[in-house]
Regions:
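Electropositive, glycine- and tryptophan-enriched low-complexity nucleic-acid-binding patches
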Residues: 64-127
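Short, conserved catalytic/metal-binding motifs centered on acidic residues
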Residues: 1, 38-49, 79, 113, ...
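Domain-level cores of phosphate- or acyl-group-handling catalytic modules
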Residues: 103-164
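A generic alpha-helix structural signal
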Residues: 17, 114-117, 169-170
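Active-site-proximal, Lys/Arg-enriched surface segment
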Residues: 4-86
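A short glycine/small-residue-enriched secondary-structure motif
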Residues: 1-4, 19, 173, 195-197
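An anionic, glycine-rich sequence signature occurring as long contiguous blocks
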Residues: 159-203
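Short, glycine/charged-enriched secondary-structure capping and boundary segments
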Residues: 56-59, 144-148, 168-170
Length: 203
């Protein structure tokens, strides 16, 4: 199977993903996936699916180690429509993260996200989505890409990666500009406390 699939350009799979989503839209299946204010929740995350120190191709990403060895890998930016109350997800066409033809420089998740956003809007121009991603995606250039493609976003942040932002939150809290929301999850016996604050600089 791998020998058959390896030479196939992933772009040839794009029409299949597009057709599946179109059929789901026509069948009203996406109506159950609406998350908030008419927007579907679109999860994006980079992942690796091949790694080897012995097997490589021209498209492999390369990681050079201090001991002189090289790890070759293939990665992709995975995408799926999700809903917190649903077990089912709707997979969308992933974007490969591979070394471009004729270059020595590795590709990266940020560049893959730019390509994904462009292709997504070409395939699904009217679909309202809210992108959710991990802390590594919480940077101004990526947010500008999402905004340019009419995508809302809900991005995670970590204190270690966004120290300045957390300082701003602490100052806003001290000034009384933070709104709190408490919620009990009785099934898990957990109490949640959320803090909301707007109009803070990211960095």
């Amino acid at each position: 199977m791998r020998e058959r699939l390896d030479p196939v350009d992933p772009a040839h799979l794009r029409p299949a993903f597009k057709t599946v989503l179109r059929h789901l839209q026509r069948g009203k299946a996406l109506e159950e996936m609406v998350f908030v204010q008419g927007h579907d929740l679109l999860a994006l995350d980079g992942t690796g699916y091949f790694s080897s120190k012995a097997i490589a191709c021209d498209s492999c990403l390369e990681k050079h180690h201090r001991n002189g060895t090289i790890t070759y890998s293939h990665q992709m930016l995975g995408a799926a429509l999700i809903h917190p109350d649903k077990r089912e997800v709707i997979a969308l066409m992933p974007e490969p993260i591979v070394k471009p033809d004729g270059t020595e420089k590795n590709d990266c998740e940020r560049n893959a996200a730019k390509r994904f956003a462009t292709k997504f809007r070409q395939d699904h121009p009217p679909l309202k989505v809210m992108v959710t991603e991990e802390s590594l995606s919480s940077n101004a250039p990526h947010m500008e890409t999402l905004q340019a493609h009419n995508m809302r976003y809900l991005l995670g942040v970590k204190e270690g990666d966004h120290a300045f932002l957390f300082e701003q939150v602490a100052q806003a809290e001290h000034a009384g500009r933070v709104t709190y929301y408490d919620r009990d999850d009785h099934n898990a016996n957990v109490h949640h406390r959320f803090r909301f604050v707007s109009n803070l600089p990211l960095n």
